[in-house]
Amino acid sequence: MPRVKRGTHRRASRKKVLARASGYFLTKSKLYRAAMEAVDRGLKFAYVGRKRKKRDYRRLWIVRINASCRAAGLSYSKFVHGLKAAGLDLNRKVLADVALHDDAAFRNLAELAKSALAVKESARLALEKE
């Protein structure tokens, strides 16, 4: 079995790790072992952060929609339920953008949701009377 010398491959992989660690504090950017630990840790945080970003944006959108709903005299949950009852399928990102930039359009959506809820409630009451 031939002897394996890892000179160029080892140097390349170490350079790659140290390049990723550039800008880290003290030995974390200079010594391979410390850089390796710091890079691994950083990559774990980056992975988690990509998942958290989705959660954080959804929470932000819900807060913005809720604020506009309250201004229109409706709670967030009733607004979303009313939109579903009206057959409108807008996602939270679009609703938050409309709430932030076009108040008149959002008020129209809120009125549409209110009317759909009223129709649904009257249908429920009619069924109860029978």
From Swiss-Prot:
Record GO terms (molecular function): rRNA binding; structural constituent of ribosome
Entries under InterPro entries matching the protein: Ribosomal_bL20, RIBOSOMAL_L20_CS, Ribosomal_protein_bL20_C
Gene Ontology BP term (one): ribosomal large subunit assembly
Gene3D superfamilies assigned to the protein according to its UniProt record, in alphabetical order: 6.10.160.10, Ribosomal protein L20
One Pfam match: Ribosomal_L20
Record keywords: Ribonucleoprotein, Ribosomal protein, RNA-binding, rRNA-binding
GO cellular component, one term: ribosome
HAMAP family xrefs: Ribosomal_bL20
Family statement: Belongs to the bacterial ribosomal protein bL20 family.
Protein name per Swiss-Prot or TrEMBL: Large ribosomal subunit protein bL20
